[in-house]
């Protein structure tokens, strides 16, 4: 009998070259694992039964590679993809590591840096499309400030808008089948990063030349750093038709960007996130933007990757149990099952409905006195999660 918690292609689980390829380096310590080549990472992901691999341009092709070196590296990568069946659903540009981007890429005060960032991104888009990417993520890790004396925030937003407009026109001119997904983060590595939350980007997108081409890529850790409910951000993006991609990991609220294995820390919120994605039928990739503990060797990295996918499927199973639990569903149905006899029906605005509502005698005390049984509902939810229901 097959394991119901083993990944299958329809689950669309993906990892980045930079995630499973992380050698365990951090700001306070040197690498603890050997660096894996992109080809080795593709074979590792095939071994753990992932669906796809994502990459920054320089995860695959070094920033100073010659054209001949670039072609050789990409050729070897394509061969590994063909051998394993691993897909490339998403790509992105590294606009944060090189010293040229120390004051931002698209929002840099230096027009030469802004122009270079556009050129680098166009080449990276070409590479991503060549390898099959249909989503292109933008994370502006350096698009911010340490001191507000250094930049005009309105001018910075204008520069960012102009860059995205340029790139959407480029994609259309090339006739690429590609959409953009913008990823928010409040801080780190900059003291403050512009457009710090998913909600910020949802507003910003509507100011672009081609908003239909641009959505968001919410990340658990980044919203938790702001102390926000991640599932609510995802729901807002879904409601707006802008949930083009998602980054799954875990994070203690208010900490530095921890990139913990998905579902390993915030158990209840991870459950409601998976439940939401499955309830609405989110069709996109489930991308794990997280890292194995620095204590691990390469075998531990495989455990991390397998654990990420298995945990998602465990939460998915719990969501099914929650939906099928009779007592839970009775409580949920009862929330809206209240007598409304005689109350004006509320729908689209009409003058008659407005007058009827203003004239209706609501029993305010009865409304306030009604118990909602949320304690019982939450307790039953915990019992599902803890495996006793």
Task: Describe every region a protein language model picked out.
Residues 30-37, 66-73, 110-114, 149-160, ...:
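Residue-level preference for long, well-ordered alpha-helices that form the structural scaffold
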Residues 19-21, 57-59, 92-97, 140-144, ...:
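Active-site-proximal loop/turn and secondary-structure-junction residues that shape catalytic pockets
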Residues 1-135, 165, 210-211, 217, ...:
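N-terminal pre-domain/capping segments
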Residues 25-28, 101-104, 148-151, 256-260, ...:
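Short acidic, glycine/proline-rich loop/turn micro-motifs
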Residues 249, 257-329:
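Active-site/pore-lining binding-face segments in mid-to-C-terminal subdomains
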Residues 8-15, 147-269, 367-389:
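Acidic/histidine-rich catalytic cores of soluble enzymes
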Residues 51, 134, 244, 283-284:
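Short acidic/polar active-site loop segments enriched in Thr and Asp
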Residues 67-93, 157-174, 202-210, 268-280:
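Alpha-helix-loop-beta-strand connector modules within alpha/beta enzyme cores
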């Amino acid at each position: 009998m097959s394991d119901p918690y083993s990944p299958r292609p329809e689950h669309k689980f993906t990892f980045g070259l930079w995630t499973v390829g992380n050698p365990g380096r951090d700001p306070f310590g040197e690498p603890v694992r050997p660096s894996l080549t992109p080809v080795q990472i593709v074979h590792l992901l095939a071994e753990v039964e992932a669906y796809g691999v994502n990459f920054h341009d320089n995860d695959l092709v070094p920033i100073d590679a010659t054209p001949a070196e670039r072609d050789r590296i990409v050729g070897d990568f394509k061969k590994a993809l063909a051998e394993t069946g691993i897909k490339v659903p998403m790509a992105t540009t590294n606009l944060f590591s090189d010293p040229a981007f120390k004051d931002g890429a698209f929002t840099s005060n230096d027009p030469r840096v802004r122009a270079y960032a556009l050129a680098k991104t166009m080449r990276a888009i070409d590479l991503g499309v060549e390898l099959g990417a249909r989503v292109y993520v933008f994370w502006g890790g350096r698009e911010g400030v340490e001191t507000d004396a250094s930049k005009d925030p309105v001018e910075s937003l204008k520069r960012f808008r102009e860059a995205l407009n340029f790139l959407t026109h480029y994609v259309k001119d090339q006739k690429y089948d590609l959409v953009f997904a913008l990823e928010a983060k409040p801080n780190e590595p900059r003291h403050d990063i512009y457009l710090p939350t998913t909600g910020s980007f949802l507003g910003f997108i509507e100011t672009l030349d081609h908003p239909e081409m641009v959505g968001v890529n919410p990340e658990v850790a980044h919203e938790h750093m702001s102390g926000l409910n991640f599932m609510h951000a995802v729901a807002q993006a879904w409601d707006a038709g802008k949930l083009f991609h998602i980054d799954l990991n875990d994070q203690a609220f208010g900490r530095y960007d921890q990139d913990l294995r998905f579902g390993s820390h915030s158990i209840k919120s991870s459950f409601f996130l998976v439940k939401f994605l499955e309830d609405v039928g989110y069709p996109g990739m489930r991308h794990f933007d997280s890292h194995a503990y620095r204590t691990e060797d390469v075998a531990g990295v495989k455990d991390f990757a397998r654990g990420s996918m298995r945990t998602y499927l465990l939460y998915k199973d719990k969501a099914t149990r929650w939906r099928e639990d009779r007592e839970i569903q009775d409580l949920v149905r009862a929330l809206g099952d209240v007598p409304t006899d005689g109350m004006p029906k509320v729908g689209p605005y009409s003058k008659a409905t407005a007058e009827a509502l203003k004239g209706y005698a609501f029993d305010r005390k009865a409304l306030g006195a009604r118990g909602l049984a949320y304690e019982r509902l939450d307790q039953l939810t915990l019992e599902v999660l803890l495996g006793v229901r």
